[in-house]
């Protein structure tokens, strides 16, 4: 019976094998539909990728908070319940990160690549796609914010609109054994969970000198943009941009010292000791791999020249002899003016057989890309079967994001990460924030249950 169905169903093409494309392709194959993944790497590299593996994490190695009463954690939990391969694999390759889901990015991407490569319904074509397929082909556009120029040009012609853009950056990574733990210390903020972070404390004099070095360091030249009109994503600002915004901006952002204490300083419960010893600012490093040999500087996205990165970052206490595995880089991210173009099903309004997913739609963050891939892949499979596409409830974090990108005001559409402000108000006002977020979570997961009957598994039952 399955062979008969496959003979009359339309195959699906997924353009791009990032987080969204990987998830979309898996959901199509999971439904019993043949799917072709077109990925330009390694034939053509992007400015930010370092390998040809699928779902390469080019910025942080963290998917955000694990707890489901946090926006990113709720989105992860929704994807787990909907059978996301990408989140399931992240759980399997997690590294210690306090209350966050962080992964060994090399093993993680390799595992996802292998899973798709070995699936009998998946065909992988390593080539650059330079134009959109015809409207007779069911296609998921998941080429991400680094879509190659020929395809981007064809997409502009198809939509009749110029794409939007912002500039994104990745943090440096250092060898763990080059960090001086006589100066730095292991701890998680407020001692939550295990001591999963390495913390480099600064006094006021060190902090001010470090900020001055950031302000005067030479930056790498970015191509194809007006330096006076550079647009950054507020959730991923370069550290030098934070330094420019004010003397204390970094201390209230990635360098905030609150909740971090080195036991060598004395008794944290002694008020006098705490006042005398507490750090003025703290740089945190998060484990990058399973073995704890590589560590990334949290919140240290940067566009400084590589030599300048080494000079300035080695001013951080504990990193004077740091050996850099990777320096930070910046790149231009392209996204669609989705509210003018997409339905909540992630189909293009002008071509129902073409769907979009991931960062190119204007969602921000790894978990959001996975959610878009899940929905686009599920709907591509349904279209291949001749079934109506679905959208996700706006009360779920995944649904709130897709409704935002398809329905937001378009005067100045900008990328949006998962956040509770996207969800409809609760019937009753709850003043306590944690209790309110818990109520949002409970409603979201309850409403998600009705969608589970429509996922690809049900299509082949």
Curated annotation (Swiss-Prot):
GO terms for cellular component: cytosol. The keyword Cytoplasm applies. Its EC number is 2.1.1.74. FAD binds at residues 16-21. It catalyses: uridine(54) in tRNA + (6R)-5,10-methylene-5,6,7,8-tetrahydrofolate + NADH + H(+) = 5-methyluridine(54) in tRNA + (6S)-5,6,7,8-tetrahydrofolate + NAD(+); uridine(54) in tRNA + (6R)-5,10-methylene-5,6,7,8-tetrahydrofolate + NADPH + H(+) = 5-methyluridine(54) in tRNA + (6S)-5,6,7,8-tetrahydrofolate + NADP(+). Its cofactor is FAD. GO terms for molecular function: flavin adenine dinucleotide binding; tRNA (uracil(54)-C5)-methyltransferase activity, 5,10-methylenetetrahydrofolate-dependent. GO terms for biological process: tRNA methylation; tRNA wobble uridine modification. SUPFAM superfamilies: FAD/NAD(P)-binding domain. Catalyzes the folate-dependent formation of 5-methyl-uridine at position 54 (M-5-U54) in all tRNAs. It is found in: Cytoplasm. InterPro entries: FAD/NAD-bd_sf, MnmG-rel, MnmG_N, TrmFO. Keywords: Cytoplasm, FAD, Flavoprotein, Methyltransferase, NAD, NADP, Transferase, tRNA processing. The keyword Flavoprotein applies. This is Methylenetetrahydrofolate--tRNA-(uracil-5-)-methyltransferase TrmFO. Belongs to the MnmG family. TrmFO subfamily.
